[in-house]
């Protein structure tokens, strides 16, 4: 490479790249802390240092029967927290059932998500996992509105085949 080009690359392009990527990392940490605080405000304990996190492919889990979600320090921690937090809502607030209809989920999830779910989970787990995956990708406002509606009301809505009456994710925020 031409020495002048290399000098330009090292003095301009590289520092700009570092500046552009550094705030993203900080924003990701802030986002995780923001989501953690949202859960903790709802009396959900979020644990990041747990013995199970030594398991090679474990990103997180919901501790059944508790108000505790474990998020390991790998992967997309925000997505993991939202996914496992939705499992908490399914177990504690929906009593083990799902909120969104299976046919609706199949229509809304990408082909890649559907393929991954088909490969990773047994048919009896598919709907719960698909719903948690879908909900983890919603805006925080939408996610926590649904979470609160399920987990703070006396009359928890029961799931139906068509859940658009309760949750319409196509409505603008």
Predicted segments with their positions:
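Bacterial N-terminal signal peptides that target proteins for export
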Residues: 1-10
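Bacterial N-terminal signal peptides
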Residues: 9-18
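Metalloprotease/metallohydrolase-associated module, dominated by Zn2+-dependent proteases
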Residues: 24-58, 97-173
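Solvent-exposed loop/turn segments at secondary-structure junctions
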Residues: 53, 75-77, 95
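Acidic/histidine-rich, surface-exposed loop or edge segments in extracytoplasmic proteins
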Residues: 62-68, 114-116
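Short pre-active-site segment immediately N-terminal to the catalytic Zn-binding motif
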Residues: 65-82
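Alpha-helical architecture
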Residues: 81-85, 127
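Catalytic Zn2+-binding segment of zinc metalloproteases
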Residues: 85-102
């Amino acid at each position: 490479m031409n020495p002048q080009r290399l000098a330009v690359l090292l003095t301009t392009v590289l520092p700009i790249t570092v500046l552009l990527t550094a705030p993203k990392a900080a924003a990701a940490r802030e986002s995780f802390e923001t989501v953690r605080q949202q859960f903790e405000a709802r009396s959900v304990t979020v644990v990041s240092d747990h013995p199970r996190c030594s398991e090679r492919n474990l990103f997180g889990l919901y501790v059944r029967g508790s108000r505790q979600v474990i998020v390991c320090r790998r992967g997309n921690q925000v997505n993991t927290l939202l996914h496992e937090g939705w499992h908490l809502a399914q177990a504690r607030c929906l009593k083990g059932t799902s909120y969104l209809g299976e046919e609706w989920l199949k229509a809304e999830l990408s082909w890649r998500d559907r393929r991954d779910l088909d490969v990773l989970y047994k048919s009896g787990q598919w709907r719960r996992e698909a719903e948690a995956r879908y909900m983890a990708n919603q805006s925080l406002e939408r996610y926590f509105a649904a979470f609160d509606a399920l987990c703070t009301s006396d009359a928890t809505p029961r799931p139906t085949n068509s859940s658009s009456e309760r949750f319409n994710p196509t409505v603008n925020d």
